[in-house]
Amino acid sequence: MNIKEVHDSWKEKGFPYYPTDTKWRNDIFNQLINFKRDTLIDRKNKIIGQSAHGLNLAWSYMPHAWGIKCGKMKTPMEIWEDEEHLSKGLNKILSGTFFMKKPAHMITESDMRSMLRRYSGTQMVSNFRPTAAAAMYDIFVDKDSPLEGTTAGTVWDPSMGYGGRLLGAIAAGVNYIGTDPCIPTYEGLEKIRDEYGHKHLKYSLNRQGSETFIPEDESLDFVFTSPPYFGWEAYGDEPEQSSIKFSTSDMWKEKFLKQTIANAYKGLKKGKYLALNVANTKQYKTFEEDTVDLAKEVGFEHTDTWWLSLSTQQGGSAVSTLDGDTTETKQKQQYMGKYTRPNISGRKFEPTFIFKK
């Protein structure tokens, strides 16, 4: 087959979305539930390791995510819709310049998704790993345990995003409250909840921005999220989206980020924790420092920092970050800020700041 024929046959098949059939989804869900999460938790170094269990399940409910812009980068959907780019990407698979070399008839949908995500100049929106979220809930939140006399705690996820933390909450067995303004995302989250949520636990999903969600006093056992990065991922055009509603970074910091942190403070029980996963990027060079300062202004005490181990691609030299792909050594040199990463070769880390009320 020549490249045009390969291109045309894929276009005829349609975009390689994740499967949506019940059997496939149930298999992935069971892998997530049966995964031994304690293997991810390194309490000595305060590191949460990485595993992708359950991530594909979240993505299978979020087909719109393939077309969401990150800064000026191209989306995977834009590559798919451009004959020249798509042909180039297919050529990389056929010639083995990008991945393992494969003949046309052996190329899978998974190969296609990988190529579309990693095509030069392309960035796909990020999702939180369900296993990492569940591990955080394991560390910070009580579960239903007749033996220990505890009942399942309630967590709030201010920026639900694409379902990684919701699936983590389901896997960990905690009650979950979530907020997010994006309509198609919200619809996907409702389906995840309806299909996989435990009947005896509560999942309250709210389509609104976290700055407008006022929890009841002392109603929360843990607040945990990865807030949006001002103006980086254009999640949707809803007027409630934080970077549409607050058009300057100062306004966004004050009215969105600080207000969300204040809402968390109001809702948390005394002695309980807020955990925020943020990282400095080229677009926002002081996101970490600003987040810690704002939390302190609200009244929190910064008691700890846990580290999320992020994916390093092929051979540990290329690293996927919120900024796009970079090499590990470059990433180490690039990091500007006061929160020094654990020095473990072949791995990249992002902080999750822990604040106590």
Task: Give the label of every model feature segment.
Residues 1-63, 67-357:
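Class I S-adenosyl-L-methionine-dependent methyltransferase catalytic core
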